[in-house]
Amino acid sequence: MSTTPFAGIADFYNQRVQTYGYDPRACDYGRAESQRRKFSVLASATDYNGLSVLDVGCGFADYAGFLAERHPGIEYHGIDLSPAMIEKARQARPDLDLRVANLFDLPSDEFYDVVSANGIFYLLGTEAPALMRRLVSEMFRRCRRGVVFNSLSTWASVQEQGEYYADPLEVVAWCRELSPWVVLRHDYLPHDFTVFVARQSSLP
């Protein structure tokens, strides 16, 4: 797998950690309230109680605490491209399994109940459409129950230059090639959407 644009993304976040330290600004989150809404939607995708979760692009692993408060008994694992992010995250949460790793480089037999990603696609550059699809496909390959991820949306009325905005309906279309059980949420922020792709129906 090519290191581009992953090396550049790692450098971007390493620099932000150097600038801001252990601070939400290092994660390029924007407003705390918008991040809380994103976490809330991700956490509502399924009943996580007792499940293993891989958080791809975990940053400071803030999502771990958010999940644990709402879903006791989860087994959280986090990976991130940025060594600086993981170093700070380990200092704050030494109890968690946190690694510097690229999703594509994990052992082929490493699986989790749910694979999650929050805000990892917007810096993918010109390769973004194809690479987003490859990343989600790899996430789905490694899940037992489902994957949940969010992205900036082309439905946003204002878009930041240089950031990737995905078309929600196009994303749903190729997610349906992975599974017929797909949920789209575009009701919590005007510029963001979340997709949950399950291996089987959530209804009895």
Describe each region flagged by the PLM:
Residues 1-23:
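N-terminal, positively charged/glycine-rich alpha-helical extensions of SAM-dependent methyltransferases
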Residues 32-49:
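Conserved alpha-helix/loop element of class I SAM-dependent methyltransferases that forms part
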Residues 54, 60-105:
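Class I SAM-dependent methyltransferase SAM/SAH-binding core
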Residues 116:
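A conserved beta-strand element that flanks and buttresses the S-adenosyl-L-methionine
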Residues 124-136:
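A short, conserved alpha-helix within the catalytic core of class I
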Residues 143-153:
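Conserved beta-strand signature within the Rossmann-like core of class I S-adenosyl-L-methionine
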Residues 163-179:
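Short alpha-helix
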Residues 186-204:
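Core SAM-dependent methyltransferase catalytic element
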